[in-house]
């Protein structure tokens, strides 16, 4: 079991460990703990229940309850002597975001509203975003990873040049970077940390969805460390509430798509985004609020009211709209879900 998700064993009758051998109860631990009274035509069964620390949950087929058998082994009815594991809770921020906040020159993130938001600093001190998806892995864009690197750079070249912060400026070490196989069309990369991060109210992964939340009109929240209304990088995490836009209108607005993304005078911002079946667009809010340079890599976070859980519907790829163009562009989480799971399992 991971030290970060260490279980707490709660024992019936304090620290008593005993086994019923016919009519005799044999102590195997704490002599200072009294035996429970015996009853006629019955016997004492001693149990242990595993529970997880706050912000973790049991990952097991059983119920976490183990009994001591005649061989002095603790076993669970469902999983035998296999011990349960504690995994990090995802998508349950302590202080969920409130409506109508903004990234471009607006209100600050409340403590713990976006605990999955990470700040990544690339070579030459450029700030970008990344999104924590479990205790040891983050999603960001391939373009973020390649900032100030040549197109011939490898993942091994890139990893040592990055600096990453989670929570309240908690520096974490990067073990490796993994790029999506076709990252020129699907602008995504994964970052693996050297160690798992302890999960708490300031550091918590967002959940990846099993269904597509990028429906036209659905509202999501995007947090970020990118440039503000004065085009200066902010020292404080900010966020904005944006609606998913009609894809056809988005493509029409940018007059098409380029793969990979490139500069063009046709675009309202002088640069053409990647637009395909793996992307969706989000428009500006009714207050003309928007994302901007440096926000890429952040999640388009949606709140599933029925589950009371926050999911990453997508990852911001094109962050150059900055209130000038009408749409930001995001990579769909459902398009990369299988690759993410496979990559994490293999690494």
UniProtKB/Swiss-Prot annotation:
The keyword Cell wall biogenesis/degradation does not apply. Expressed by the liver and secreted in plasma. It is found in: Secreted. One of its GO terms (cellular component) is blood microparticle. Glycans are attached at residues 125, 148, 152, 182. Residues 31-88 form the Sushi domain. Residues 103-345 form the Peptidase S1 domain. It holds the Pfam family Trypsin. InterPro entries: Haptoglobin (IPR008292), Peptidase_S1_PA (IPR009003), Peptidase_S1_PA_chymotrypsin (IPR043504), Peptidase_S1A (IPR001314), Sushi/SCR/CCP_sf (IPR035976), Sushi_SCR_CCP_dom (IPR000436), Trypsin_dom (IPR001254). Residues 1-18 form the signal peptide. Its main location: secreted. Residues 259-264 are annotated as: Interaction with CD163. GO terms for molecular function: antioxidant activity; hemoglobin binding. Gene3D superfamilies: Complement Module, domain 1, Trypsin-like serine proteases. GO terms for biological process: acute-phase response; defense response to bacterium; immune system process. Disulfide bonds join 52-86, 90-207, 250-281, 292-322. Keywords: Acute phase, Antibiotic, Antimicrobial, Antioxidant, Disulfide bond, Glycoprotein, Hemoglobin-binding, Immunity, Secreted, Serine protease homolog, Signal, Sushi. Transmembrane segments: none annotated. PANTHER family: COMPLEMENT COMPONENT 1, S SUBCOMPONENT-RELATED, HAPTOGLOBIN-RELATED PROTEIN. As a result of hemolysis, hemoglobin is found to accumulate in the kidney and is secreted in the urine. Haptoglobin captures, and combines with free plasma hemoglobin to allow hepatic recycling of heme iron and to prevent kidney damage. Haptoglobin also acts as an antioxidant, has antibacterial activity and plays a role in modulating many aspects of the acute phase response. Hemoglobin/haptoglobin complexes are rapidly cleared by the macrophage CD163 scavenger receptor expressed on the surface of liver Kupfer cells through an endocytic lysosomal degradation pathway. The beta chain mediates most of the interactions with both subunits of hemoglobin, while the alpha chain forms the homodimeric interface. Tetramer of two alpha and two beta chains; disulfide-linked. The hemoglobin/haptoglobin complex is composed of a haptoglobin dimer bound to two hemoglobin alpha-beta dimers. Interacts with CD163. Interacts with ERGIC3. This is Haptoglobin. It comes from Ateles geoffroyi. The lineage of its organism: Eukaryota, Metazoa, Chordata, Craniata, Vertebrata.
